[in-house]
Amino acid sequence: MIFNNLKNQNKIINFLIIFYFLSFLKQIESQSINITSSSSSWQCRGDLVYRNVSNRIEDEKIGFNFVQYNGTYQSCVIPCPSPFFTINEWNKFLNMSLVMGTISFFSGLFLLVTYSPIVNKTHNRHTIGVMCMSFGVCLAMCSDMWNFGSNFTEKSICPSPGQYLSTSNARCLSSGIFLQFGGVFGFLNWTLLSFDLFMNIKGIITKNYDKYYVSGTFIIAIIFTFVPIVNDQYSMSYIGLGCWLGSAMYQLIFFWILLSICLIVSSVFIILILKEVYIIIKLSKQKTSLKGNIRPLICISITGFAFFYMFFYYISIVVEGDYYERVLNEYTDCLMDPTKDISECKSPRMSVASEFVFLLCLRLLGIGAFIFYGINNKVKKIWLNSYWFNNSFVEKYISRKSADNDKSNSNGSKVLYRTNNTNNNGSFNTGLESSIIEMSTNSNKEESSLNSVDEI
């Protein structure tokens, strides 16, 4: 019995020893974590973010950019967003992109619906070109929709502090594909529009190659969009608000070279168009051709300016790439140097105005196209001839409204509509036509314009 008591006491003593030993190890581990945390906090000064460098290669694949100091990678990464702009400036860029991108998206969507078979009954090179360009604009502007509800102070676009979006992120990949495909498809069809405008002014009639135009531009856009995925090229850059082609080489091959070719070709057509317009003004009193084409001419010119600005801004960034890389390295070296005070470290900066205009140009394309292709008598005529304004429900509503207006204006001081049963074209319902015409101060002029030759 005595031996049994001793055995029980030994078990208790052993348990207490083990418990004390485990508590001691836990205390040492806690102190070690505190020391490591304190060390990492001291090491990653300023806006640098701590990240253990032991798994650097895998971390770089998911968007972390590690800092080098004295030729060695450190456990610190570049902050996201980058220090090239302040947080306040980044938020201004983001707010502008959300507002202008949304307006541009719905502008492009209106044109897409208007010129599509959903509304438009007849098609030619011009309407197909506008429809395809609008489709590209809508896709490109969709990339901004991913940023709704985000900013750089509370719910950041960056997945985590110091982490940039990369191909491994589904949101990044999808928005990058939309932006790339929409951009390529949009400016290819914009180039075809300049060609179509030149052919129209010259009065040249060619065979119907619409199917080849659409198929060719679509295939090119598909190739230039999905080939970069093979090497995981869609990512967020130091100066971007979202994902696009990450490598400068891929940007050059799969976007800027093609864009420069389109710019050269379209510029030639624009010069030829201006020449023809000058001849029309100088030698002919007929203003029909000039009046019908001046609106799309301005649209193409403004769009060309936007593309040219984006192209030359990109070239300037590439040319000065070594400079920006050097100032960023100098900034991180200063932060990593324990002998220097943080106040001595000068943050790398880029031109806020130039970046703002660059981000704005792409988002103006849909708005510009809407102004010059969506606000004219041609669009009104398309909608008036469409099913949406020629069905039993609308006719009943318009007829009732027209009858009420006739009754309230029976003194004859104002005529809201005229019945025309002899119109060979049979283009519009009278009640619907009068409802639109009453918005104009001159009904005769409006009706005449609706039955005139289609504008481009």
UniProtKB/Swiss-Prot annotation:
Side of membrane Extracellular, spans: 31-92, 149-174, 233-252, 319-354
Residue ranges of the TM segments: 93-113, 128-148, 175-195, 212-232, 253-273, 298-318, 355-375
Compartments it resides in: Membrane
Keyword Transmembrane appears in the UniProt entry: yes
Region (Disordered) residue spans: 403-422
Glycosylation site residues: N34, N52, N70, N151
Membrane topology: Multi-pass membrane protein
Signal peptide: 1-30
Cytoplasmic side: 114-127, 196-211, 274-297, 376-456
GO cellular component: membrane
Keywords: Glycoprotein, Membrane, Receptor, Signal, Transmembrane, Transmembrane helix
Family of the protein in this entry: Belongs to the G-protein coupled receptor Fz/Smo family.
Protein's name according to its UniProt entry: Frizzled/smoothened-like sans CRD protein F
Lineage, top ranks: Eukaryota, Amoebozoa, Evosea, Eumycetozoa, Dictyostelia
Gene: fscF
